[in-house]
Amino acid sequence: DVTLPGLLQEHGVDLFHGTCFAVPLVGGRPDTAASGFRVDPGTGSHAGTDSLGIRVGDAITMPKQYVSLAGNRATGRSFDDRVGCAAQILALRRLDSRRLRHSVLFIFSTREEVGLEGARFAAQRLGGEPIRVHALDTFVSSDAPLEIKTFANALVGRGAVARAVDNSSVTPPALVDSLAALARARRIPLQIGTTNGGNDGSTFTRFGVPDVAIGWPLRYSHSPAEVIDLADLLALADLTRAIAEAW
């Protein structure tokens, strides 16, 4: 059997037939056989589907565009880790270099999902020189209707997240407390979370550098329809700036 990964649940697809496309819905459960999936173009009969020009063998692709949802919410693909990059850029734009207590290095690294390769190169170059490292990465949230709340229960729309524990590192509790105090002083909404997965900052721990990973809550991670709250992005940018200026 051919199985499809868990990212293919219910979401929109673009269905191409000639020069036109429809935006139907794919239905099914994750990790089920490909034959168990269907495309629903919204028609009520075979004849109605034929009238749209849809034929067996037509190709489908996942939507690639950014879509605004209700309130501050948005959906799209690859928010992990485009949101982290956006937060760093916003922090850099707002940073007051006169307030820096230390030299601060911003790194945009690549290939995290296939072995932390970009971050590992940076860690090898810098060694134990940094005081701390802060990976800006997705916090895969259980804030969705069908998710179990035991783990990763940081709510979308409630601010940035500090990772206390994940599979790659344990943040020293004193640093978690200090970060939370900084966020309170700057009136930045911050949640403390524990989760599975890992983060780029763990490549520095072998050199004795504490990894204090921060991020934002994300629904439906690694799918073409990830969901974020833009307020969380802004909170992460503010927290990144505060860390650079005052910690």
Task: Describe each region flagged by the PLM.
Residues 1-247:
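N-terminal hydrophobic/helix-forming segments and targeting peptides
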